[in-house]
């Protein structure tokens, strides 16, 4: 039966795990689009008319959520197995924070991406010479186009995200969107 070191060697191995797990969160963030400046709410992300980036952001959120839940368990297992002299130095909190950072970036990609899709229609609507209109119809084409963007995006997000992160997306979107409208 082979044995393994529960001292310095195991401590070094867990440090390597921490480094690799932190790098993995950066790889996930790297799968997301880079921010564009110029939004009234700070950096914005665009996911265009296709849904590939939207889907990737949801996958990043789901993967980072899983990792953020399992990393503390890994830390607990290492602390159980490692020598007492090293146990108090085993801390995976920074790694867990990396995954929460990835989630936050992905949620921001989703909320500002939807905002960017809507802004095209809102900007067109704002440029209309409304004072020249004599009467108002039942529903403007702007309302229909804004509704269609929401119908195309929001149900897909609801299907792909857990309730917690769908709510986080909604909160983030409303915060940035209302700041533009008010």
What is each PLM-predicted segment?
Residues 1-182:
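Extended alpha-helical rod/solenoid/coiled-coil scaffold segments used as assembly/tethering elements
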């Amino acid at each position: 039966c082979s044995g393994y070191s529960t001292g310095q060697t195991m401590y070094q191995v867990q440090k390597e795990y921490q480094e690799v797990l932190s790098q993995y969160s950066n790889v996930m963030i790297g799968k997301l689009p880079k921010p564009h400046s110029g939004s009234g709410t700070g950096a914005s992300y665009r996911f265009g008319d296709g849904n590939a980036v939207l889907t990737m952001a949801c996958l990043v959120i789901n993967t980072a959520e899983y990792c953020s839940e399992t990393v503390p368990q890994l830390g607990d297992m290492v602390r159980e197995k490692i020598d007492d002299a090293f146990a108090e130095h085993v801390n995976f909190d920074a790694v867990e924070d990396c995954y929460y950072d990835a989630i936050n970036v992905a949620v921001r990609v989703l909320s500002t991406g939807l905002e960017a899709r809507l802004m095209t229609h809102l900007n067109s609507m704002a440029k209309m010479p409304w004072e020249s209109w004599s009467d108002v119809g039942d529903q403007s084409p702007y309302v229909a186009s804004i509704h269609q963007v929401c119908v195309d995006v929001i149900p897909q997000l609801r299907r792909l995200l857990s309730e917690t992160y769908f709510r986080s997306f909604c909160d983030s979107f409303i915060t940035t969107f209302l700041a533009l409208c008010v």
